[in-house]
Each structure stands twice: as structure tokens, then as C-alpha cells.
Amino acid sequence: MSADRNANRNDEALKDASTPVGTAPVGIDELLERVRAGYDRIGPAEAATAAEAGALLVDIRYAALRDRDGLIPGALVVERNELEWRLDPRGSHRATEAVGHDLRIVVICNEGYASSLAVASLRQLGLHRATDLIGGFQAWRAAGLPVASV
């Protein structure tokens, strides 16, 4: 068997193993569209208003971006790879801010893409009021909302 045919067969096997039975793989744009169809996203002004009303703003940007661009005052900083563990109210590693499943959470990434995927995961944990910021931190800053230096 030629190397190309063997490589194609391996690619197909990997695709089959990682795709739930009965579903075809999708691209990231379609995945985002599907995820976002399940909830209402909010803009910067609405996120600021939500925070004033008690919502938890959660900044999932990585450290280099926070160092470069600053922080949203009052936002909880949680690395993306720890998010579910820190916000699951039933989890043993939860943040003190993770007070219950009814908590309004606004997830913020840099531009509003990774946050949508994070919200899908939080909603699977029962955090049904989780949403994300359209345009992410960059939209927050462009709207002239408060940003603190690191």
C-alpha cells in the first residue's frame, strides 16, 4: 500500500474515532454558529451593566494578553484550561465566586471566539445563565469601559 493511501486511511480512522456516532465533523465556524444559537451574547455596555447588577465577569485571556492590554477591574481571572473546575459550584476546586448554578457569568476572551466555546462548556455544567462578551476584551476597551494596568 502506498504511503499516501496509508496516511489517508489513518486520517479516516482518526476522524471516525473522534466523531460521535451519527454526526459529521464540522468546521470551527459552524461549531461557533451552533454553540451561539443556544444563548444570547451581550455587548460591552450590557456586560458592564450586568457586572454592576452582580454578574461575574470572567477573563479567560492568557497572561501575555493581560500583561499587554490590562485587566477589567473586578473581573475574575481564570485561565481557560481551568475554567470548568473553577466555576463548577459542585467542584472541589471551585473559586469562592462560584456560588451556584443560578449565577450570571459573562466570559471574556480577547476577541469573543474562545469565550463562546467556554460558555457552551459552562452551560453543560448547569450554569444556564452563562454568556459571553461579543468582541471580547478588545470590544470592552474600544467601548471606553474601565481597564486597569497590570
Regions found by a protein language model. Give the residues of each.
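Rhodanese-like catalytic fold shared by cysteine-dependent sulfurtransferases
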Residues: 1-56, 63-104, 113-150
